[in-house]
Structures are given as C-alpha cells and as structure tokens.
Amino acid sequence: MDGIGILGLGIGLGLLIYLSFKGWSMIPTSIAASLAVIITNRMNLWEAFSVSYATSMKNYAGTYLLLFFLGTVFGGLMGESGAAKSIAVKLLNTLGSGKGLLIVVLVSGILSYGGINLFVLLFTIYPIALVLFNNENIPKRLFPAAMLLGSATFSMVGLPGSPAIQNLIPCAVLGTNAYAAPLNGTLVSIVMFALGMFFLVRQQKRLAVAGIGFVPGSRDDLNKIRISQDDDLPHWALSVLPMAVLILFIFFTRNTLDTVYAVNIALSIGIAMVLCLFWKRIENPLNSINESASNSITALLNTSVIVGFGGVVQASSGFASVVDFALSMAMSPLISASLATGIVSAATGSCSGGLQIFLDSLGPKYIELCRAAGIPLEILHRVICLAGAGLDTLPHSGGFITAIVYTQLTAKESYKYVFFTNIVVTSIGCVVSILLFMALGII
C-alpha cells in the first residue's frame, strides 16, 4: 500500500477544499491540488497534466459544451420572458406562501425521478427559485442544497423505478432492475426527504434570526424576479409548455437516443418554443443569448478543471491503493459493500464512478457472498446505490461546482448545507436501509 500516495490524495483534496473556501478560482485551485497529488505520488509532472488532467478536462468540456450553452440560454430566456416568474407565482398561489424551499425540493425530485439530467434541472429550476426565494426572503445560499436534496438523494437512488444512471448501473451485474427493494427504498426515501426538509427549514429560520436573507447576484435582475401586482406575465399554462415539451422529449427518447444528444435536442426545441411564444416579451433576445453563452463557458470551465483534478487522482498510485483497500474489507457483505462503494465514490467525486469501479472489480464476488449469507441481491443493489450517493458530493463534485458557479455563490457560503442534505442525510439513508433489512427483513 502506498501510504505517501494516499496521504497525498488527502492533502490534494484538503487543499482543494481550503482554497475554494478562501475564494480562489477553480482553475488555480485545481492545479494546486493536482500538484500536491502529483508530487506525493511521484508522478511524471508533464504527463500528469498533459494526459491525465487535460484528457479528463477536455473530454468533459467537449461532451457538455452544447448542453451547458443551450441549458443556460433556455434558463435565461425563461427568466427574461417572465415565464419563470409566472410559474413561480402559480406555485405560490396554489401551495401558499412560505413554501419556497419545499417547492424547489419537490419540483427537483419530480423532474429527477422523471429522468431529467441534473444540469438541465439546474438551468430550468433556478429562474423559478429566484422568484420564490426573493419573494420569501430565503437566502440564496440554500438553493444548491434544496435542489440537490430533491435531485440527488431520494429521487436518484432511493425511490424504486428511478431512471437515474446511478440506479441502473447495478442492474447488469446483479441481474436486478430499477425497482429493486421497493419497500425498503420507499421507506428510506421518506426518511431522507423528512430529514433534509427539517434541516433546510431550520437553517432558513436560523439565518433569518441572524439577519441573513435573499441577496441577488450581479446577474440576477430584481425587476424580473420581484413579484408585483402590476406584473404583466404570460399565462402560467403557456409558460409551462416549453418545460413540459422538453421533459417529455427526453422521457420518450431515453431508450432510442444518446442521453446527451437527446437533451441537446430537447433544449433546442425548448429555446425555439420560448422565442416563438414570448418573443415580444424579451427585450433583447440576442443580448440574452450572448450573456448566456459567456455564463455557460464560465460554469463549464470551472466544472471541467475539477474533473481534470479527478483525472489526476484516478491515475495516481495512491488512488489504486485506496480502491484495493476499499474492496478488500472483510465484514458483513452489505456493510463492506457500502463502505467500499462510498470510499471509491468519495475519491472519484462520482456516485456512478464509485458504483462502476466496485461492480467491475468485485460484483461477481459479492453476488456469491450475498447468496451464501442469504442476502437478496435486490437489497445489495439498493444499499450500494445509497452508499455511492452518500459520499459523492464532496466539494470537488461536478454537480456542486456547477451549481455554485451558475448561481454566483461560493463553496464557503453553500457547502455546509449541501454536506448535510447530500452526505449526512444519504449516509443515514444507507444505514437505515441496512437496518430495515437486517432487523426487520424489509426488502
């Protein structure tokens, strides 16, 4: 085992967290953190940056460039046209005031369970959340936690039938399906939702007592998000139409088109619909598109360089040692599988990455262990999904970085809330899942 290399991974990750909390840009932060890993793991400096870092970064940027651009344009036009505000007002009138956080969590969960990509979800919900948060004076720093609680916990790996890739990866190896351990997953999802909402509401109240409320970013137009009796807004049903078409297109093409390709087409259709329906309401469409292009590149680049850091980590000897250790733990199959998946997911910053590495390396072995111990593979499926999601949202997580950059927040402002909703809550969910099976036999 490479002790120095493993220590280097810890130093690199610690440096990444420290510098991002100190307000450093993601580019120098990722380079400094990568250097710590490269030096302690005795890697070739040029090869590490030109191959491991650069390849991971460019692959991510190349794959998601159009998605980030189109998603940012769609979200920008929804806000500029008043459609996002119209939807927000309808939600407030239907559910009542004081439900801003609940609305964001529920809508995020519903869209995620419907198969909507996290990035599309962010671009779609943020304009609506701005109106809700401004109207109820909810600190914007709670938005990433609310969105990620809805989209990356119970709806992604808890609820049976979720189309999320994280819930589908185990199927091929374990011979299970998306509905594995339905009662267990449903009960765990209720626990996660309740804990997350309790935490968010409590934090909102604590921030209010401290005098901290909604503060718009430099790109947030108060005139577009402030609710007034004099607002001339499009009808809410018309406003929902572009979103509905976008979501339905992704849903119905999920098995016939590449996911990213389908999302790009859906966003293009959504943009065309917004322009056709609300052209007269958009003051300067070209300016809105140009601003969105700049904003999308900033968000994409900041996320891509963190993925580059992840590429360096995965190429290091320390990472190989961490994976070997995680996959060699001898204890109850459910417990060792959950710990192994969680550790690898934390190292990669990816639930899907952790699941894939675990299943590729030890999937067949754990099938034998579970069968010998009388453990249904359905419960193994559910437990490792929860474990992977429990430790994948560290500060170098791509989803978290994109959320804070796009919303003009900082890790220092937002991460402690995300840490609870997406690491503490999901880890508790994993423990509850294991206990429900071991104590009550609930699958």
Where are these predicted regions, by residue range?
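Hydrophobic alpha-helical transmembrane segments of multi-pass integral membrane proteins
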Residues: L67-L70, T94-L130, S304-I306, M329-E368, ...
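Interfacial loop-to-transmembrane junctions
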Residues: L91, A293, A403-V424
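Alpha-helical transmembrane segments of multi-pass membrane proteins
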Residues: G98-L111, I138-S155, A181-T186, I190, ...
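Long, contiguous bundles of hydrophobic transmembrane helices that form the permeation core
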Residues: D2-L9, L13, T40-N41, V173, ...
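Re-entrant/interfacial helical elements at transmembrane boundaries that shape
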Residues: T72, S86-A88, V120-L132, G161-V173, ...
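Core transmembrane alpha-helical segments of multi-pass membrane transporters/permeases
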Residues: P28, S50-K85, I110, T259-A320, ...
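Short helix-coil transition sites and intra-membrane helix breaks within transmembrane domains
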Residues: G23-M26, A61-Y64, G75-K85, S112-T124, ...
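Hydrophobic core segments of alpha-helical transmembrane domains in multi-pass membrane transport
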Residues: G8-S20, I31-I39, F68-V73, V107-S112, ...
